[in-house]
């Protein structure tokens, strides 16, 4: 689009970037959870509260609730019912994503959703084995989010995916797993660069792709849906950013997600992990679309994982209270499963504490020690 509006636009061509290799990163792939060792380890459950259908669960820890939820996941897998996982970027950045990768490879997870920040961290980990810059250190000099490869390669992948008529998540999968697609992305990103010697050029593949959830899902043939906003991601800061491409490809992903929700007519599980707004809102709209077309998610089971105490009170419904606006507690853990005759769980705590025992219970339920 050629802008013809009344206001002055920022000229993104003036933005200065730097090679990703010179930027320090705070987290390494080597720090990721060792799921093989976890399977053999003793199960340790958090002692923070857990809730079922908005009511406190019992026991000295979360073991009863996590076992119940794991049982639902195992039962759905064996019955061929969908199991969907939505996360923010932090489960990727804090090293818990190997849990999702294993469940994808085993055919348990049937669709994975995240935001563009999740795609960004996945890209940097797959390319360099490290991610997560220091915002505090980089912001004063205007270097925050300005690593060239992160912006250019991801933006070009989205733009080429747009031209190919595929979704944003599928474009990311092809970047890691399709050599021809990857070459197009790298060539386009570097086309106007006079000196490319300092840039990573992964023509032969991404060295750490095995730690990438997008690659795992693409190889398994299941969707990854990326639910994007404009102006929320470091890729939007770059001259290579194409808002039309980002919107169109993410829009396609949303329709893929909505279609997956139509498979829940006889039940299924949705896990919402660390996404307080994106996940709940995407789920709410998709569920409404499914119900509108005669394919309501009957008996839906949800699991919501976050650090905040559970304070939502669906009986009072007091819009003057702050708890009313905690969308994950309201929609994911309470209202959506209640409306469709299902069960909603909420587990308070850091993902590093709540996700490993859930994974252990699932794997043992599958008979994998």
Describe each PLM feature range.
Residues 226-263, 267-269, 281-284:
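Conserved mixed alpha/beta catalytic, RNA-binding, or beta-rich assembly cores of soluble enzyme
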Residues 121, 133-220, 225-226:
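Ligand-binding beta-strand-loop-alpha-helix segment within the catalytic cores
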């Amino acid at each position: 689009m050629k802008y013809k509006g009344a206001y002055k636009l920022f000229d993104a061509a003036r933005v200065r970037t730097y090679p990703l290799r010179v930027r320090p990163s705070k987290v390494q792939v080597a720090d990721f959870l060792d799921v093989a060792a976890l399977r053999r380890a003793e199960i340790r459950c958090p002692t923070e509260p857990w809730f079922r259908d908005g009511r406190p669960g019992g026991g000295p820890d979360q073991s009863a609730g996590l076992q119940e939820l794991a049982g639902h996941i195992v039962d759905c897998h064996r019955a061929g019912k969908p199991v969907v996982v939505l996360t923010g970027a932090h489960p990727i950045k804090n090293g818990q994503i190997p849990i999702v990768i294993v469940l994808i490879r085993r055919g348990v997870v049937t669709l994975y959703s995240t935001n563009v920040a999740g795609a960004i961290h996945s890209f940097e980990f797959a390319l360099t084995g490290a991610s997560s810059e220091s915002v505090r250190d980089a912001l004063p000099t205007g270097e925050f989010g300005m690593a060239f490869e992160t912006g250019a390669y991801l933006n070009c992948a989205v733009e080429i995916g747009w031209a190919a008529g595929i979704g944003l998540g599928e474009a990311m999968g092809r970047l890691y797993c399709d050599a021809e697609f990857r070459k197009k992305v790298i060539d386009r990103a570097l086309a106007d660069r006079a000196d490319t010697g300092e840039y990573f050029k992964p023509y032969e593949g991404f060295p750490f792709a095995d730690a990438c959830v997008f690659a795992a899902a693409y190889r398994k043939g299941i969707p990854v849906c990326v639910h994007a906003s404009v102006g929320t991601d470091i890729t939007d800061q770059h001259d290579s950013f194409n808002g039309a491409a980002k919107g169109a490809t993410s829009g396609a992903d949303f329709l893929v997600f909505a279609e997956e929700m139509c498979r829940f007519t006889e039940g299924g599980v949705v896990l919402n992990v660390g996404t307080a707004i994106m996940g709940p809102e995407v789920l709410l709209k998709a569920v409404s679309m499914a119900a509108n077309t005669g394919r309501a998610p009957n008996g839906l089971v949800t699991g919501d994982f976050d650090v905040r105490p559970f304070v939502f009170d669906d009986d009072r419904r007091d819009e003057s209270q702050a708890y009313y606006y905690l969308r994950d507690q309201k929609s994911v853990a309470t209202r959506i499963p209640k409306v469709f005759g299902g069960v909603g769980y909420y587990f308070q705590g850091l993902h590093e504490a709540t996700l490993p025992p859930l994974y252990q219970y699932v794997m043992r339920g599958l008979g994998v020690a």
